[in-house]
Structure formats: C-alpha cells, structure tokens
Amino acid sequence: MALWGGRFQGETSALFKLFNDSLPVDYRLFEQDVVGSIAWADAIASVGIITATECSDLKKALNDLLVEVNGDPAIILASGAEDIHSFVESALIAKVGDLGKKLHTGRSRNDQVATDLKLWCQSEGAALLARLQSLHAELLALAEREFDAVMPGYTHLQRAQPVTFGHWCLAYVEMYERDISRLADALTRANTCPLGSGALAGTAYKMDRHALAAALNFASPTLNSLDSVSDRDHVVELCSTASISMMHLSRMAEDLIFFNSGEANFISLSDEVTSGSSLMPQKKNPDALELIRGKTGRVYGSLVGILTTMKALPLAYNKDMQEDKEGLFDVVDSWAICLDMAALVLSGLKVNRPNALLAAQQGYANSTELADYLVSKGMPFREAHHVVGEVVVAAIAKQIPLEEFSLAELKTFAAIIEDDVYPNLTIEACLAKRDVLGGTALPQIQQAIAAKKAR
C-alpha cells in the first residue's frame, strides 16, 4: 500500500507507478534508511510519542530487517514498494504490526530522504578519500622509482624541455592532493543533519535535533527546514569534485596512452590492464586508460544533469529531486572504479629509459639553454631568443643537434659564444639548471618526494 493513499479514490495507473516509483534506484539507501529510522525511534521516544518498550521493539525489528536484507538483498526489489522508505515501513509493520505505523510520526519522506542521502554521501565519500589516497601513494612510489628517468616535457604536444618521469608523476600527485582536499572539504560542508525538518516547516514535536544529529554522527543539525529538505548541494559538490578528479585522471590517461604508443614508446603497460584485437594478433591496447578517459564524459553528464534539475526549483521539495540519485550513484561508481584502475595501471608500469632519453635528446629541447647561455654573456633575452631561433633553423637544415655545430659555426650567429657553451647543452645541464622549488632538477624531485612521504 502507498504511504499516501488516503487522499485518493481512484486507482494509480500501472504506467504512473512505473514512472513514479524510485525503488529500482534508491534501494541503495536501504542501510541509511534503517539507521535513520533507528535514530528517529529514539527521537520520538524522547518526546513521548512511543514508550521506551515500543522504542526498543522498533529498533530490534529494524536491526532484524537489516540482517535479513543483507543476507538476501533481492528482498527489496521483489517487494514492489514505491521507494526504499515505503519498503522499510511496510517490512517494519509486517514485523511489529500497528506499532510500525507510529514510526513515521513527525517525519516526512522529505527530511528522511535528505538524511539518507547525506549519510550515503558521507559513507561513500570516506571510501573515495581512501581510494584517492591509495592512488596518491602509488603515484608517489612510481615517482620515487623513476625520479631520474629522463624524458621530454611537452607543450602543444611538441617536445619542449627535458624533464624526468619523476617530475611528471609529481605533477599528478599535486592534482590528486587537490582532489583529496576538495573532497574532504565537500564532506565537511555536507556534515549536517536534516532529520527533524519535516516536510518543509519543521517537525511538530519539540525534540533535541542536536542529539538527533549526534546519534547519526553528523557534526550538527541543519538550521533552516526549508533549505534542509530542498538542499542538494552535497550531491552537486560530490559530482563536481568527481568531475574535476576525473578530468585529472583523464589527462593522466591521455599522457600514458601517448607514452605507451609506438610513436613514443616511453613506457610499457602490464598485461593486467591491456587487451588485444580480435583481428590483429600483434596489438596490445591500453583499454584501461581509454576507458578512464571515456568514463569522464558520463561523470560530466551527471554533474550537468543535477545542476539542470536544480536550477529552477522553487522552495521547498519537488519531485524533480527524485532524479538526484541515479546520476550521483553512477558518478560515485565510475569514479571509484577509475581510481582503482588507475592505481593498478601505475603499479605495473615500466619506463623504457633509453627511448625516453633519446626522445629528450631530439627536437632541440636544449634551445632554451643556449638562449640562457647568451643571456649569461650579456645579451638581452629577447635578442638571444631570436638568435637561437636562427641557430635551430640552421640545425634543422643540416639535420644535426645544436651541440654538433662547431664553435666557428656558432660564432657566425653570435660572436660572444665560446667553448664553454657545450657543457650547457647537455641533458644533464638542462635538468640541473632547474634547481628551484617545483623544478625538474633531481635534488628538487628528491626533496619533493621526501616531503610528501613525510606528511
């Protein structure tokens, strides 16, 4: 039986029931709904709605239901209930009879679902934080293993300056640290309890909402009942945080896909995270990374979906808000598996040092060093930049690297060039000169790794 049937004389159409029912989605809130109901039983007992014995009986029945459903989750969907709240209430009434009908006193599904969803976000958010921290640790370990593996750094996907693979790893370590901070911050803001807000105006029973919030491990109760039942900022923030993190994961995946390609061949991926072709027997495809990149779009879509759903809703609750869960659940599932998969990819990744070094030695990545050398001899940088551009054009024409020009040839471009130019053009010199906080010099990378490990 529907929880709202008394007002209606006609039958609900089968099509409307299919359209309206949310149990196939919100069944995932079962545990949170039971936990919230147990806390609510204590709350209504505290204001005399039920006796201590009745409260004890309700809580026992709810805990029994929790055990039963955990043993056979199919019970929920087989019930045909409208939503998870209806399922729990109906199952409770089946266990304790009319006593079960008292539980919803002073409570609305509006504050009930808002509470369930915040509890779910807190639980899943904590698990996501752990996954982010695991990925962070895996990437930091890779940075430590390969801190001195030289590779080209890119701008515009063209070789720019030499860096190390450890430096590349640390760039993504920074991104994931921001993701960790962002998620923790979002969970702090979501740590307020809406229960006791009723449908929109607050419950009619003068209970201690601070105690109710504490019973559910929230930091505090919400402060405005209209906002409490209509707020979905925590859903938006979780989807937004996931979207930013997925953007970082996708960028990392794209880099690694390129590094793994035959054109670069800087790294090799484990067989664990690659697949083959049904036609071409030589193929070893980076499917794990491509799927991370592909799943990013669906996470973005869910963020846009919840923002669009919420953008024009009047206060307080509207049925549109039932659409908040499907996208959120998919976001959390997608983000979680992508974090796990990214960590697995990194754990089996091998750097092809000779190929990466060879690529760094090509493409005139030491051009900036020559310009800096000219500056050290007194030439203004803008003039030095122009001179080195001419040197590069000549080197391309001769198909040689800059360091293979004779001193006499280099002097035709700038008479101030001397023999001491050549040590400045080595890969080692290119790296060593970037000995500044955040730079790619090996001591800076080692210090950065040590500092992050010490946290």
Curated annotation (Swiss-Prot):
CDD domains, A to Z: Argininosuccinate_lyase
InterPro entries: Arg_succ_lyase_C, Argininosuccinate_lyase, Fumarase/histidase_N, Fumarate_lyase_CS, Fumarate_lyase_fam, Fumarate_lyase_N, L-Aspartase-like
Pathway: Amino-acid biosynthesis; L-arginine biosynthesis; L-arginine from L-ornithine and carbamoyl phosphate: step 3/3
MF terms (GO), sorted A to Z: argininosuccinate lyase activity
GO cellular component terms given for this protein: cytosol
Keywords: Amino-acid biosynthesis, Arginine biosynthesis, Cytoplasm, Lyase
Pfam families cross-referenced by the UniProt entry: ASL_C2 (PF14698), Lyase_1 (PF00206)
Root EC class: lyase
Example GO BP: L-arginine biosynthetic process
EC number: 4.3.2.1
Keyword Plastid recorded: no
Reactions that this protein is recorded to catalyse: 2-(N(omega)-L-arginino)succinate = fumarate + L-arginine
Subcellular location field: Cytoplasm
Matches recorded under PANTHER family: ARGININOSUCCINATE LYASE
Protein family according to the UniProt entry: Belongs to the lyase 1 family. Argininosuccinate lyase subfamily.
Protein name: Argininosuccinate lyase
Organism whose genome encodes this protein: Shewanella baltica (strain OS155 / ATCC BAA-1091)
